[in-house]
Structure formats: structure tokens, C-alpha cells
């Protein structure tokens, strides 16, 4: 009981559960992205501002080089996603593939399959986006 009282006293908000399947997700079109791109907002951490989304991009879509001030994690659900971080080699993820993209590292992602790419993204803090020229 002391633990519960401590949580209330410190004002820590308890997280809400999120349980969904791809087939049940409510997809919305992303403004500013190519036709056919969609996302599903899953949750945001009230304390860190971190977010989790499902994202779909059409075949051939390239996400231009950019970086974030926070770490990013990607898990590919369908398609083939090319990932390049910093000056490292390009790696193609297949379904089930995982990428950890460190904060402030330039990243470039592209859907290199003949079908759309669907993936989960988690940012561990408030999202910002810095384009690289």
C-alpha cells in the first residue's frame, strides 16, 4: 500500500494498455508524405513525450536523410526496408527485422520492396526532425 500511496503522492501517471493487430488498426493518411502513406498513433508517454506508431509507406518511398534528438527503434512487419545510419553500410531489413537508430545520428530509410513497407516506430523522447541537406 505504501507503494501505491507513493505513486499518487509523486503524481506519476500510470500508463494505459494498448493491444491491437495490424488488421484492426485505424490507419490515417499522413499529410505531407507521399500518396499511400499511412500511420496509426499507438501511444505517447506523458512523462518523456516518447511516441509509438505503426507506419506504412508505398513501395519505392525514400525518407530523406534526417536525424532526431532522441533514440528511435524500428521493427519491420512487412516489405523490405533499407536502413543506413551515419556513415555505416546500408542494411536491408526483412519482416521481423530490427533497427536501433541512436539520437543525433543521420538516418536514411527507404522501402525497397515491390510492396508497401509496414513498420513499428518507437521514439524514446519528444520527437523532433532535422533534415540534412
Question: Language-model segments: what does each one mean?
Answer:
Residues 1-7:
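Sec-dependent signal peptide recognition
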Residues 47, 58-60, 80, 104, ...:
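Solvent-exposed coil/turn segments that connect beta secondary-structure elements
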Residues 103-127:
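Ligand-binding loop in jelly-roll beta-barrel domains
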Residues 14-51, 132-133:
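A short, N-terminal "cap"/entry segment at the start of jelly-roll beta-barrel domains
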Residues 51-68, 102-104:
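Conserved short histidine dyad/triad with adjacent acidic residue
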Residues 7-15:
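Hydrophobic h-region of N-terminal signal peptides that target proteins for export
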Residues 47, 87-104:
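Short acidic-glycine-tyrosine-enriched beta hairpin
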Residues 58-61, 68-86:
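Glycine- and acidic-residue-biased ligand/ion/polar-headgroup-sensing regions
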Amino acid at each position: 500500500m505504501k507503494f501505491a500511496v507513493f505513486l499518487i503522492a509523486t503524481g506519476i501517471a500510470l500508463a494505459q494498455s494498448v493491444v491491437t493487430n495490424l488488421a484492426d488498426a485505424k490507419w490515417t493518411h499522413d499529410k505531407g508524405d507521399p500518396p499511400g502513406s499511412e500511420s496509426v498513433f499507438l501511444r505517447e508517454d506523458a512523462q518523456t513525450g516518447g511516441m509509438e506508431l505503426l507506419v506504412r509507406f508505398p513501395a519505392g518511398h525514400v525518407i530523406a536523410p534526417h536525424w532526431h534528438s532522441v533514440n528511435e527503434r524500428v521493427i519491420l512487419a512487412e516489405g523490405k526496408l533499407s536502413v543506413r545510419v551515419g556513415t555505416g553500410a546500408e542494411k536491408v531489413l526483412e519482416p521481423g527485422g530490427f533497427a536501433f537508430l541512436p539520437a543525433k545520428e543521420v538516418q536514411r530509410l527507404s522501402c525497397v520492396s515491390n510492396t508497401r513497407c509496414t513498420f513499428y516506430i518507437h521514439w524514446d523522447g519528444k520527437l523532433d526532425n532535422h533534415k540534412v541537406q
